[in-house]
Design a protein with these regions (language model features):
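N-terminal periplasmic/intermembrane-space "pro-region" immediately following the signal or transit peptide
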Residues: 20-126
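Outer membrane beta-barrel
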Residues: 92-283, 313-331, 369-384, 388-390
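Transmembrane beta-barrel outer-membrane domains
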Residues: 100, 146-152, 188-195, 244-248, ...
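Outer-membrane beta-barrel translocator domains and adjoining extracellular loop/strand segments
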Residues: 121-126, 182-190, 223-230, 277-286, ...
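Transmembrane beta-strand segments that form the barrel wall of outer-membrane beta-barrel proteins
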Residues: 169-178, 334-340, 437, 504-507
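Detector for outer-membrane/organellar transmembrane beta-barrel domains
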Residues: 327-483
Length: 536
């Protein structure tokens, strides 16, 4: 019932009550009518209060949905959250929200069933292990791999409200890529939920926004402004996204300023962690994720076998800054990263200990550019610096170790990724991406005369041509690159949500730094097919 109809009914009730009251003055015998009139007046007062509450709630919902359209839909495909596709009519019930004590709650996410076939056995689930693609001489390079998985399904809840002129938001998102010690593919397939995002946000009308919690890194390119839930993710089915994609999800405290929806600036302090690779590790070294003093018990990245279950001992948070521009066409970003690395050589009965500290940095860019009347969206991003490895999909190491002093040495690294999404029809999106990640050589000779550092030319590849002896085949990744393409086809879109079917083909190539003997390489081709149901 509209407010206008309710108001007319109230006026009619008032007029009737007045008429009855006048009759009552003329005829004192109808005291029962006086009681009924009083009850009607109380009911009308309650109705007016209820109308005011409904109008306030509707106003809050309209304000939230109008000011931040991106926040009402967590999409997987780039740009879909920001614009309707040609020929599509959105249901008035989408997205479906409900209200509780002045708050607007919006559930989201998708349920997915995926099958994949790899030409090389990575021993991985839905996420590719880019830095561990089997080398050509290994048994895994001669075995294919089939997997089926529902673990990439995501569930989320967005909570919005207002306190005076301040908008309040909270968001939680989870998938099922966690793995308890008893998780397996044998019988029950009992995979555990995994936290992806959990944050709170205060948004002031002056353009200031404060975000705290676990979220996508500020280094991740956005689709619009510098807004949470507007990250520009590659649109495929690979759980590790694309080689060259810059991202983490981690604890952060971020402050953002919006200047008239044209320019945005942001600064963040985010959770640090150090990954390393070294052909020689000095004795008694502390502070690394494999050191005796490291905290253990949590598997950080279960689909990347290079990582241990320890945590590095960190000196300070990573410092990040970003400026975003939207001059009227496209979205453009400049971003920067500062990092701090530390380890320690422990003292012994005959030697003194010492602590080593060094810094890393990164400078990058991002862009999203629409063409062909917004039917074609082209994206490009890159990052260059020292010690930036863990911020990329390939998981290249941040640093190596000086064999003499034990000091961490941030590696020279670079990455780039580009791609496009073509909205061919209202039901069909076509996409393609390519990316490359590189880690520079930083080689030494150890005190014992052996190979040390990262990418040492003294590393022997003699065992890399023997399938049985491949366990002794070691080397440092020089670069990893990928090319991928696929599509998403919307089978249904309406008040019950939407159902999409997608296929993706991935080619990955892994190069090692040269050593003694023929340098091995690795490559893999992966084919995905998925069916997804997005919640309305």
């Amino acid at each position: 019932m509209s407010r206008r109809v309710i108001s007319v009914n109230i006026l009619m009730l008032i007029a009737t009550a007045g008429s009855v009251a006048q009759t009552d003055n003329q005829d004192p015998t109808i005291t029962d009518l006086q009681r009924q009139i009083q009850e009607m007046r109380l009911q009308m007062a309650k109705m007016q209060n209820r109308i005011a509450e409904l109008e306030t709630t509707r106003g809050i919902a309209a304000t939230n949905s109008g000011a931040d359209p991106v926040l009402l839909q967590s999409e997987t495909h780039p740009t879909q959250a920001l614009q309707s596709q040609p020929g599509e009519t959105k249901s008035s019930e989408e997205p479906t929200s409900f209200h509780y004590k002045g708050l607007t709650l919006t559930p989201g996410g998708f349920l997915e069933g995926t099958m994949l076939l790899r030409t090389r056995n990575e021993n991985a689930d839905i996420a590719n292990s880019y830095s561990a693609i089997p080398l050509n001489g290994s048994s895994n390079a001669k075995l294919s791999e089939f997997r089926g998985s529902a673990r990439n399904s995501e569930l989320s809840l967005l909570v919005q409200g207002t306190a005076g002129s301040t908008k309040l938001k909270g968001y939680v998102e989870a998938d099922f890529l966690g793995a308890a010690p008893t998780a397996n593919y044998v019988e029950s397939n009992s995979w555990t939920p995994r936290l992806r995002q959990l944050w709170v946000q205060l948004d002031k009308p002056s353009g200031w926004t404060i975000t705290a919690g676990q979220t996508w890194s500020l280094l991740t390119t956005n689709q619009q402004g510098i807004a949470s839930l507007a990250e520009l993710r590659p649109g495929g089915e690979d759980g590790q996204y694309v080689v060259g994609f810059t991202w983490t999800r981690q604890r952060a405290f971020r402050v953002t300023k919006n200047f008239n929806n044209k320019v945005w600036t942001a600064f963040a302090v985010e959770e640090p962690e150090t990954t390393y690779s070294a052909a020689f590790v000095p004795a008694n070294i502390m502070g690394l994720n494999t050191s005796p003093n490291a905290a253990t018990g949590v598997n950080l990245l279960p689909f990347l076998p290079n990582y241990s279950s320890g945590f590095s001992t960190n000196l300070a948070p990573d410092l990040l800054a970003k400026v975003a521009f939207e001059p009227g066409w496209g979205h453009f970003e400049i971003k920067a990263l500062g990092r701090f690395f530390r380890d320690r050589i422990a003292s012994t009965a005959t030697t003194n200990g010492h602590t080593n500290t060094t810094e890393g940095y990164g400078l990058g860019f991002g862009a999203l550019m629409p063409f062909a009347n917004k039917k074609l969206d082209v994206s490009l991003e890159g990052l260059l610096g020292q010690g930036i490895g863990r911020y990329g999909s390939s998981g290249l190491p941040d640093a190596t170790i000086n064999p003499t002093t034990g000091a961490l040495r941030p590696l020279r690294e670079a990455r780039i990724m580009g791609g496009f999404v073509y909205h061919h029809r209202s039901r069909l999106d076509l996409y393609a991406y390519g990316g490359d990640e590189y880690a520079g050589r930083d080689a030494f000779i150890s005190p014992t005369g052996t190979a040390a550092g990262y990418g040492s030319p003294l590393v022997s590849y003699a065992s890399c041509t023997n399938e049985v002896a491949m366990n002794g085949c070691g080397g440092a990744n020089r670069n990893i690159y990928e090319a991928t393409a696929g599509y998403w086809y919307r089978l249904y879109r309406g008040e019950f949500g939407r159902i999409e079917q997608g296929n993706q083909v991935v080619y990955i190539h892994r190069n090692l730094w040269s050593g003694i003997g023929t340098t091995p390489q690795g490559s893999d081709v992966v084919v995905y097919t998925s069916l997804r149901f997005y919640l309305p």
